[in-house]
């Protein structure tokens, strides 16, 4: 029998955390983070981790596992998340995978075969130097030329994955997108997608950024910078962190940083929706619909009746 798995996806700021907590309480669930940045210690406010209180009421997994200067690959995430799903299922609890990092979530839910190509330090060094000299956009444009399919999935600032894709192409002569294959899911999965009208979502995102700033995002970034290692790592390019770094270094004003965070978050939400709209298995619900939660609850109960309180 395939292990059961509830998957909750959607754009940033739409309310995935609140829904996952509610469903976890109703269906004896445990939550697995599907966010590529929540694995890092000290990156709490900017990644919108569940609060310590929320984490104390419902078990959470794949959060606060690594230092921000440690590397973490999709393949590592796939292996860890699948292990957690089996462990949770063995406790007769419902595994709930929640997040907005499409590539990570798809890699877990589907039989996503990763390209098995050994890293080449010389190629990586060469590409890193090119990025330092000409900027991240230069490498992203190069990737668009050799692997447009994979380039569309990556933000120009996602330097680590851009370098990996170019490295694979240089070593094999084949685009990475042709070496990653998706087939049937090894899980009995139910996909729930949350959305809302775009203008309302954008307003919600703007308010959430204001809340993050009030909670101490600037202080969080200053503490990370004080380690002396954070700025050199890909994690420092996450939305909210890269803008605050530029403000702290005196390159932009506070108002410019706030505006950039909000704009970057809205653009990210748009990309997330585009990614998830490709997945036909997702049952979409409008968060603003007063009947949405009841309908979601019925859907989950129908799929996974044995977990009901």
Task: Annotate each language-model stretch with its function.
Residues 1-309:
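Phosphate/pyrophosphate-binding catalytic cores of soluble transferases and nucleic-acid-acting enzymes
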């Amino acid at each position: 029998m395939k292990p059961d798995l509830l998957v909750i996806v959607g754009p940033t700021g739409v309310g995935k955390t609140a829904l996952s907590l509610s469903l976890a309480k109703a269906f004896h669930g445990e939550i697995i983070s599907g966010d590529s940045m929540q694995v890092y210690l000290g990156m709490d406010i900017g990644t919108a981790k569940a609060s310590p209180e929320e984490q104390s009421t419902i078990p959470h997994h794949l959060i606060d596992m690594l230092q921000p200067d440690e590397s973490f690959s999709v393949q590592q995430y796939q292996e860890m998340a699948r292990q957690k799903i089996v462990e949770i299922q063995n406790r007769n609890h419902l595994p709930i995978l929640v997040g907005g990092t499409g590539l990570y979530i798809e890699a877990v839910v589907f039989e996503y075969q990763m390209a098995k190509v050994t890293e080449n330090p010389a190629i990586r060094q060469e590409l890193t130097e090119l990025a330092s000299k000409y900027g991240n956009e230069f490498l992203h444009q190069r990737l668009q030329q050799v692997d447009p399919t994979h380039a569309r999935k990556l933000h120009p600032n996602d330097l680590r994955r851009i370098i990996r894709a170019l490295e694979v192409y240089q070593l094999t002569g084949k685009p990475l997108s042709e070496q990653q294959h998706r087939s049937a899911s090894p899980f009995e999965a139910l996909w729930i997608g949350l959305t809302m009208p775009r203008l309302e979502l954008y307003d919600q995102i703007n308010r959430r950024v204001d809340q993050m700033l009030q909670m101490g995002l600037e202080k969080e970034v200053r503490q990370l910078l004080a380690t002396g290692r954070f700025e050199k790592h890909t994690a420092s390019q996450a939305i909210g962190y890269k803008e605050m770094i530029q403000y702290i270094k005196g390159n932009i004003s506070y108002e410019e940083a706030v505006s950039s965070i909000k704009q970057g978050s809205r653009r990210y939400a748009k990309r997330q929706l585009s990614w998830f709209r490709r997945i036909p298995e997702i049952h979409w619900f409008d968060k603003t619909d007063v009947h949405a939660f009841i309908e979601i609850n019925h859907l989950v109960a129908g799929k996974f009746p044995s977990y009901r309180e």
